[in-house]
Structures are given as structure tokens and as C-alpha cells.
UniProtKB/Swiss-Prot annotation:
The gene is folE. Homomer. GO terms for cellular component: cytoplasm. This is GTP cyclohydrolase 1. Zn(2+) binds at C89, H92, C163. It catalyses: GTP + H2O = 7,8-dihydroneopterin 3'-triphosphate + formate + H(+). It comes from the Archaea. It comes from Saccharolobus islandicus (strain L.S.2.15 / Lassen #1). PROSITE patterns: GTP_CYCLOHYDROL_1_1 (PS00859), GTP_CYCLOHYDROL_1_2 (PS00860). Belongs to the GTP cyclohydrolase I family. Pathway: Cofactor biosynthesis; 7,8-dihydroneopterin triphosphate biosynthesis; 7,8-dihydroneopterin triphosphate from GTP: step 1/1.
């Protein structure tokens, strides 16, 4: 978490002032009707999209399987698929838009994470200037080092990058897929393939 001495309103004012300067350098008139409020809107949008830099990481809510006396399957794999995310590419500050899939192997203690907490972790690490390869690594580390202490974590990212969509090569179809492995997933190809099959089968039967 990065520290700043400026409060939110002051941050908006300072960023907006610089956006006005950029508009002028681009040959625009920031005082014309359509642009009068643009600097402040852009400032607020940038602060929202980078909020993960200035807020503490979310805590994972832990639940325990078997606490009701029921027997649970050992080495159970939990899969959270199709977590929508958006981030800003750190090279061009243009959007990255896609989906994250998270799989983890439940520890012998039977601890599992609250569903929404995994989504919050994805959102937290997405909310900053980012590259997709690092994003999946950070999500994997956060879950692997959490209180649920999984035996393994696998995080898959699949996204469109606007830096290649609207500029440069202007490829409208290309997507980037990145995968991070931790624990048992790191060396066990069968477990990796099992997760890919789960995702493939879920897509075939339109499981949402």
C-alpha cells in the first residue's frame, strides 16, 4: 500500500490540473463545453482504477469443512471461474479487460475461503497499474499465503489489452493468457490438466 499525504479531494484537484495541461498540449481547449468537467472526471476515474495502491489488502473470511461433523473429500479442488476484472496496463495506461479463474486445493484442516473474498482479492490487485503476468502471480501468492493455507493454487488470466486493440498493431482478436502455479499445482501436471478440463467442461454445458 502506497502512502500519500494528500486527501482524496486534494488528489482529485492535483490530478485534474495536470489533465488540463495534457489536454492543452494535445491541442484541445479544456474550457470548451464538452471538456469543462473532463479533467475532474478523469482524475476520479484514475483514482478509482488505482485504489489498490492506497488501500490495505482484503482479509479472507475462513470457513471450515467438516465442522458440522460431516466427512469431506480430501484434496478437494475449489474452482472460482469467470471473475470479471479490469485493470490499467502500466506501459500505456490503457485498459486490460478479461476474466480470472482461481483454483485451490483444500488443506487437510479443511479451511476454505469465502467466495466473495476471492473476488475482492482479484479486484484489489487489478486496481493499479499492472501487467497481466504479475497480476496472476500476486493473486496466487495472496491466496497461497492466506489463513486457508491451501496445498496449491492455480490462477489463470485471459484478457484483451487495449494497448494492442486501439493502437500499434490494432489487433481486435488477440488475447493474453497467463497462468501462475503454487504448491502442488507447480509440479503436478495431472492437477493442472484437471483444472483445465473443469473449465472446459463447465463452458461446454454453459455453467455460469
Amino acid at each position: 500500500m502506497q502512502k500519500t499525504e494528500l486527501d482524496d479531494q486534494k488528489l482529485v484537484e492535483e490530478i485534474a490540473r495536470r489533465i488540463r495541461e495534457i489536454l492543452e498540449l494535445l491541442g484541445e481547449n479544456p474550457e470548451r463545453e464538452g471538456l469543462k468537467e473532463t479533467p475532474e472526471r478523469v482524475a476520479k476515474a484514475l483514482l478509482e482504477m488505482t485504489s489498490g495502491l492506497r488501500t490495505p489488502p482484503p482479509q479472507i473470511k475462513v470457513f471450515s469443512l467438516g465442522e458440522d461433523g460431516e466427512v469431506y473429500e480430501k484434496n478437494q479442488i475449489v474452482l472460482i471461474k469467470d471473475v470479471n476484472f479490469s485493470s490499467l496496463c502500466e506501459h500505456h495506461m490503457l485498459p486490460i479487460i478479461g476474466k480470472i479463474h482461481v483454483a485451490y486445493i483444500v488443506s487437510n484442516s479443511g479451511k476454505v475461503a469465502g467466495f466473495s473474498k476471492i473476488i475482492r482479492i482479484v479486484n484489489y490487485y487489478s486496481s493499479r497499474l499492472q501487467i497481466q503476468e504479475r497480476l496472476v502471480e500476486q493473486i496466487a501468492d495472496a491466496i497461497m499465503n492466506s489463513e486457508i493455507k491451501p496445498k496449491g493454487v492455480m490462477v489463470i488470466g485471459n484478457a484483451i489489452h487495449m494497448c494492442s486493440y486501439v493502437r500499434g498493431v490494432k489487433d481486435k482478436e488477440a488475447k493474453l493468457v497467463s497462468v501462475a502455479y503454487r504448491g502442488l499445482f507447480k509440479t503436478n501436471r495431472a492437477l493442472q490438466n484437471h483444472v483445465f478440463r473443469l473449465l472446459d467442461n463447465a463452458n461446454k454445458v454453459n455453467l455460469l
